[in-house]
Every structure is written in C-alpha cells, then in structure tokens.
Amino acid sequence: MLFKKIDDINPLILLIDSCQYTNQIMNSYRHRNQTTSFIRKETIDCNIQLPRKIESDLLLSLSSNTDDYIPIINSLSNEDHINILKYTIVIDNVNYLEKILNCTSIDLSVNDDILLCTAIINCSSECLLYLLDKGIPIDFCDNYAIRACCIRLEKYIYTTRKNKSSCDMLKIVIDRGGNVNTHNYEPLYSAVNDNNFDKIKLLVENGANKLSDFKRKITNTNLEIFQYLIDNRVELEVNFDDIFLQSIINDDSECMKLFIELGANINSIPTLELTKIIINARHEILEILINYGLDINNINDKINNEINDNRCEDYDETIKTVELVSNAGIDIINLLKVVIQNALSVYNFTYPKYSI
C-alpha cells in the first residue's frame, strides 16, 4: 500500500532534490537556542572571593558558637558581604545566613533580587523560606521564582545536589502564592518543554489553564503530556502546524496523529523535511503522512518549485547529472534507493532530540 502511493511521486525530481540536500541535512535542525535569558550568571557562580586565610577563618568562626566572625565581617566591604550571603544561600545554611544579616547593614529590600534568585536557582529551599518570611514578596524580580522553577534548575546547581528538587521548589513557590499563569502562561510552557510531568500536574492542579507558544516554539512532544492537558481542559493556544512538524522531527508518530486530529495541516510540511524523512528512510513517519492524506501532487509541485527557486551552479550540475542518468535509461527508482542507502551509511543522519 505504501510503496504503491510512493510511486506517484515523480522519482526524477525527488532524486534531484535528495542529491542536492544530502550535504545540507547534517547541519539542519540544530538545537534551537534555549538559553533562559532571565537566569543570571551571578546567581550561579557563587564563590566567596576572599583571600584563602580570611575565608577559612570566617567559615570556621561561623560554624562555632562564638562571635568571632563579627570582626571579620566588619572588616569587609559591602560587596564582600553580598558574596558571603550568596555563598551561605548556595549551601542552604540558614544559620550562617542569619548570622551575616544580623551583623551587617544589608537592606533586603534593595538586595532581594540577587539573594532570592540565588536561592531559587540553587534549589536552596530553607534559605528561600527564610527570605520569604522576612517579607520579600513571592513575585520579586518580575515573577522570577515561578518562572525559574519551571525549567530544569538541576543543571545550574553549583554545589552538591540537595534534597530538594526544582519540583519541590515550585511547590513552595505556588504554596506562597506564585502566579502559575504569569508572562503569557510561561510556567506551563517551560514545564512542557522540560518534559516534566510532575511540574505540569502541579501547575494544572493549581490553576494553569493555557499552553501557549506565543513567545517560543514548543520543542518537546509527549503524547501522555498532551493527552493530560486535553483531558484537564487546558486550552492549547499553539500553532498546530509547527508542533506537528516538531513531532515529525522528534520521531513521535503518536503525537503526529494527535496533532493531525487537532487540526494540523498535513500538507504544511516543507519539502526539505520530506526529503530528510526519505533520506533517513523513516518508513513509519512517511506511511502516516501518506495514510492521513498527504497530497502527492502538491509535493511534486513543491519539489519542482524548490528546484527552480534554488537554481545555482551546483544545483544545475546536479540536475544535468540526474537528467543524463535518466536519459541513459538507468532505473531511477533503484538509483534513488541506492542514494538513500548510501546517505544512511555515509552520513548516519539523525534527527536530534531537543532538550532545555
């Protein structure tokens, strides 16, 4: 059934297109830039940055039951005080944090962003709760807390892994009143792209009601997640053509079918993507496309247009070579099979899985 329909595609123009794209596919669909702009470097790199002797004396005195740390603190600059506070937060030691705050003039209302951001990004739950109890609002720094908790914070953690995970931190933030739909529903978007079902359930159970790709494309597809969102009546404000293409890239046949049923246009697939599917010999994906109504005439037209729109010296050489082979009577269908097999053997094409 599949190959009977495949024969309807003009093999000559498909061979031209396949040959021309073979060397481009290795560099296509690189990982999209998923750097999170609101994650501040100074909240991750948290060394005390003091001379070794002073640092050693300070940590020793902080761990004792004496006040020997006070003269050391008093001899340091305000910048040093901030660095020391950040360090105590990174190691999540509330006792040290309180001692430093009590003997300095640091104003939490002025430095709340750097201190709380450090607590969030390092999953320092005890220090986070302490600072919140001191009156710092949960929506500090443009709702940083809940936005950061919905990405995979563990990859940023500076010190040894703590007992608390970013999901635990998210629960704390939500319990303290964090806005689950802030920034155009960014928390749920981040949790979906992180493929974190626990965070998704936590957000939905606490009022997250829309998945939006308004700011960035959704790169993760997971049938269980999307079925959960649908079952819980979460509005999907997404470009189904884009996410359908992403499911193809992710080799996710089940999500492909779901997105087609939700309204994705199966004929929106670009010719380059179809070429890559064929070059990669991804039989199951191709079979779904055809069985769900891929317009073969439209594909032939697209490939013809692609060839005409990208005419250049190299492309002309490709066309001349393929036409010469065809005119000589060489079996184009079998030759295309060889091209695909050689491409698989030589280049080992793969579709990279996206991660955050």
Swiss-Prot record:
Keyword list, A-Z: ANK repeat, Repeat
Gene3D superfamilies from the UniProt entry: Ankyrin repeat-containing domain
Keyword Repeat carried by entry: yes
UniProt entry tagged with the keyword Ribonucleoprotein: no
Domain of life assignment: Viruses
ANK repeats: 111-143, 152-182, 183-213, 215-238, 239-266, 267-298
Signal peptide range in chain numbering: none
Descriptive protein name: Putative ankyrin repeat protein R599
Organism: Acanthamoeba polyphaga mimivirus (APMV)
Classification of source organism: Viruses, Varidnaviria, Bamfordvirae, Nucleocytoviricota, Megaviricetes
